Amino acid sequence: MRKKVTERKDEQEPKGGEPRRMRVDAQRKMVSLLQAALEVFAQSGVDAPVREIAERAGVGLGTVYRHFPQRSDLIVAVFQSRVDACADAASVLAIKYEPGEALARWMQRFVDFIATKRGLAAALHSGDPAYSALPGYFNKRLLPALKTLLDTAVSAGVVRPGIEAEDLLRAVATLCHGPHGAEPVYARRMVALLVDGLRYGATTPIDPPKNRHR
């Protein structure tokens, strides 16, 4: 009986590295699909034809629907992939740069994230229950990433203590959503000024949130 099972398994699984190559190909297609969806949504809105996304990704229409039966499934996946990319960049930057520079570069990455998120805004703010878990996902991934960079910069004495990661995310988002926030050059310049403000008087703590409105 065992021999038969083994033979059947050998028939189903290609030899050598073929299964691994198949997994790599599948992952590559998924990355291409999500990137294509992001670009199409940014250009044409979240109601853009799925066929347009498939053509840009170089996959069949059936592939899109097999992975994402509903349009909302695709939108959620695109949003989460952008959040993950932004969050994962924190550890990479922390290795490559000194603490203050790593924090500054990550904040510019967050500016890029907000820019890409704009193409999904109509769906994310529609009130559809399909997107209700996304704010929690955003906070779960991005707040710890920023907090680690921020705490490291504070410990190194290059950023003022007393700054909350959540406040910093909101500050950057506010700058990006201002009258000229949609202009990448403007948003980057404003965030660079914000970073300079964090560095100024690095040994002077900022009042914690509970004391700010007394």
Label every PLM stretch briefly.
Residues 1-17, 112, 144, 148-159, ...:
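C-terminal peripheral helix-coil segments that are non-catalytic and often amphipathic
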Residues 123-131, 208-211:
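Short linear capping/connector segments at secondary-structure termini
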Residues 58-68:
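Short hydrophobic/aromatic patch on the recognition helix
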Residues 77, 88-116, 131-134:
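Hydrophobic alpha-helical connector segments
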Residues 75-82:
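Alpha-helical DNA-contacting segments of helix-turn-helix folds
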Residues 1-56, 73:
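Basic, helix-initiating cap at the start of DNA-binding domains
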Residues 72-74, 119:
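A secondary-structure capping/hinge motif
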Residues 45-46, 66, 160:
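Helix-turn-helix/winged-helix DNA-binding modules
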